[in-house]
């Protein structure tokens, strides 16, 4: 005789499905704002500290997928969730550097032992970085030895990147020279990965080769960048050659980040500063991190030029958090405060440094 189904079977199935959903959220490594239980329920013993929001902390910010507005405290929740925080910049954008400095300042204060990693420094410069952190050389010598003074544009290092390194020095925190030396980047283009893989071990320590192919959209974006948005013809073989260099940048930075993450205390975080092309749309850098550390939780932040009161459609999907560079200002009309319309935007500069790719 056929047994009638137990009347609680449906409830049990729903409960099982709910548990599976919660487990899936808990295991998410890409979007902290999908983890609703985590986001709305503080950890036991934690406290909520209101932050005064001014300067870079007051800028307009939105969730990069659905456009929901967030504030600095919401961004901070994402940082708290993450193991690795990637902050993408346009190299000449002052607002982006102020956001990076604020994120690093608060991260290293909240989680001592965290590390800051920079695209702008190369592995063969790590000894110079360490000498500066140890007080063996002064800032002027550090900048001279690394040739960094004009890295983003003439005379910008002192304002854009040195404050981050000085904050790390004061906090006794590691600074990671994450990138591959430019000679090896060039050789990736001219000689290919097989030739680099055959180099002696001491040289191979200066770079990492890609662990996986990037998303197909990454090459398409790179081709578009090389063609100036389709304004000029580009040779497809040339695109692939230059993309080899770009991918080795991504792989070496990812390898540096993951190595730092693995040797830091369990509570500590890695904050990586990088040109936004590398990290947007989960591009080459993020895919290389995931290939090397699939269980590391990665938060991506991108800072865009210009003002916005909502997520711009062209920025959807670029990062977990999209920040716009100028906060709307209040103006008074009678007894009501209203938002002052943003000034007319100037198109963002898209020129690359002479030695490579910018964004």
Language model region names:
Residues 23-26:
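C-terminal motif of bacterial Sec signal peptides marking the signal peptidase cleavage site
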Residues 57, 80-90, 141-148, 236:
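Acidic/histidine-rich, surface-exposed loop or edge segments in extracytoplasmic proteins
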Residues 90-93, 121-125, 181-185, 276-279, ...:
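Solvent-exposed loop/turn segments at secondary-structure junctions
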């Amino acid at each position: 005789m056929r047994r009638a189904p137990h009347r609680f079977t449906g409830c049990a199935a729903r409960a099982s499905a709910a548990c599976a959903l919660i487990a899936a959220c808990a295991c998410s490594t890409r979007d902290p704002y999908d983890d609703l239980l985590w986001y709305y329920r503080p950890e036991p013993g934690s406290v909520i500290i209101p932050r005064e929001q001014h300067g870079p902390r007051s800028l307009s910010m939105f969730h990069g997928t659905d456009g929901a507005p967030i504030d600095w405290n919401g961004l901070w929740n994402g940082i708290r969730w993450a193991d690795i925080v990637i902050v993408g910049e346009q190299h000449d954008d002052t607002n982006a550097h102020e956001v990076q400095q604020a994120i690093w300042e608060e991260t290293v204060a909240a989680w001592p032992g965290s590390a800051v990693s920079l695209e702008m420094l190369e592995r063969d410069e790590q000894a110079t970085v360490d000498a500066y952190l140890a007080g063996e050389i002064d800032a002027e010598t550090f900048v001279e030895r690394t040739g960094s003074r004009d890295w983003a544009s003439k005379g910008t290092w002192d304002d854009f990147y040195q404050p981050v390194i000085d904050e790390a020095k004061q906090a006794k925190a590691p600074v990671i020279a994450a990138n591959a030396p430019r000679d090896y980047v060039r050789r990736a283009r001219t000689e290919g990965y097989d030739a680099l893989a055959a180099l002696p071990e001491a040289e191979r320590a200066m770079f990492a080769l890609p662990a996986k192919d990037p998303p197909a959209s990454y090459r398409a974006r790179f081709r578009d960048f090389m063609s100036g948005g389709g304004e000029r013809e580009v040779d497809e073989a040339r695109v692939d050659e230059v993309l080899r260099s770009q991918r080795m940048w991504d792989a070496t930075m990812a390898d540096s980040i993951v190595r730092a993450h693995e040797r830091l205390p369990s509570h500590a975080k890695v904050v990586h500063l990088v040109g936004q092309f590398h990290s947007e749309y989960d591009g080459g850098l993020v895919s290389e991190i995931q290939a090397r550390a699939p269980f590391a939780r990665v938060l991506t932040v991108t800072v865009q030029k210009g003002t916005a009161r909502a997520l711009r459609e062209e920025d959807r999907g670029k990062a977990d958090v999209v920040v716009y560079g100028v906060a709307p200002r209040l103006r008074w009309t009678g007894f009501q405060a209203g938002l002052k319309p943003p000034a007319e935007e100037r198109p963002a500069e898209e020129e690359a440094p002479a030695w490579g790719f910018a964004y």
